[in-house]
Swiss-Prot record:
Family according to the record: Belongs to the ATPase A chain family.
Protein name: ATP synthase subunit a
Originating organism: Drosophila simulans (Fruit fly)
Keywords: ATP synthesis, CF(0), Hydrogen ion transport, Ion transport, Membrane, Mitochondrion, Mitochondrion inner membrane, Transmembrane, Transmembrane helix, Transport
Consequence of substituting V187I: In strain: HW09
InterPro entries assigned to the protein according to its UniProt record, in alphabetical order: ATP_synth_F0_asu, ATP_synth_F0_asu_AS, ATP_synth_F0_asu_bact/mt, F0_ATP_A_sf
UniProt-listed Pfam families: ATP-synt_A
Gene Ontology cellular-component annotations: mitochondrial inner membrane; proton-transporting ATP synthase complex
Membrane-crossing residue ranges in chain numbering: 17-37, 72-92, 99-119, 125-145, 170-190, 195-215
Subcellular location(s) of the protein: Mitochondrion inner membrane
Molecular function (Gene Ontology), one example: proton-transporting ATP synthase activity, rotational mechanism
């Protein structure tokens, strides 16, 4: 039973090529169209969303943030949001439900922040290990706690996104598997529940991409 449930997350292969991962890059096919087509209402709405995110990330980074650094986090948000939504369509591989992708996004970002901070702002990074007002007797323990909490950050970022994507898809799969054994009346309620769950999954897709980008921005602001 569990094998069948999780089989929707298995990347299949054709001619020894894992073609499912190509769904991650489908968004690249849509980017060139904005340069030669007249902007539609959807483009205007999307541009306003990106502008709002730019202002928010710039506020989170503070005055010490480098110019243009917000585009990294906006691109990260766009990539995760696109793949989260693509995973909601039938027969499209959900790449963000795999730690292979989420950890590949979180770990290099965290490593870059840490290397930049410890090389250029060493004293500032040491000061982060001991919160202000900590009693002297607790300082060694706080250093250990802060170090561990810092090390697990990329893991928590990746697992949070992966777990949220898997949970919703598993619920949809469970409900879908019960359909053939139900009466027509119960199938109506089942479809209503699945539509409601799909709407909730759309909200989760947006929220999780936003959370991933915001937390990455906050981690970046700590090393400046």
């Amino acid at each position: 039973m569990m094998t069948n449930l999780f089989s929707v997350f298995d990347p299949s292969a054709i001619f020894n090529l894992s073609l499912n991962w190509l769904s991650t890059f489908l968004g690249l096919l849509m980017i060139p169209s904005i340069y030669w087509l007249m902007p539609s209402r959807y483009n205007i709405v999307w541009n306003s969303i990106l502008l709002t995110l730019h202002k928010e990330f710039k506020t989170l980074l503070g005055p010490s943030g480098h110019n243009g650094s917000t585009f990294i986090f906006i691109s990260l948000f766009s990539l995760i949001l696109f793949n989260n939504f693509m995973g909601l369509f039938p027969y499209i591989f959900t790449s963000t439900s795999h730690l292979t992708l989420t950890l590949s996004l979180a770990l290099p970002l965290w490593l870059c922040f840490m290397l930049y901070g410890w090389i250029n702002h060493t004293q500032h990074m040491f000061a982060h290990l001991v919160p202000q007002g900590t009693p002297a007797i607790l300082m060694p323990f706080m250093v250990c706690i802060e170090t561990i909490s810092n090390i697990i950050r990329p893991g928590t970022l990746a697992v949070r996104l992966t777990a949220n994507m898997i949970a919703g898809h598993l619920l949809l799969t469970l409900l879908g598997n019960t359909g053939p054994s139900m009466s027509y009346l119960l199938v109506t309620f089942l479809l209503t529940a699945q539509i409601a769950l799909l709407v909730l999954e759309s909200a989760v897709a947006m929220i999780q991409s936003y959370v991933f980008a915001v937390l990455s921005t906050l981690y970046s602001s700590e090393v400046n």
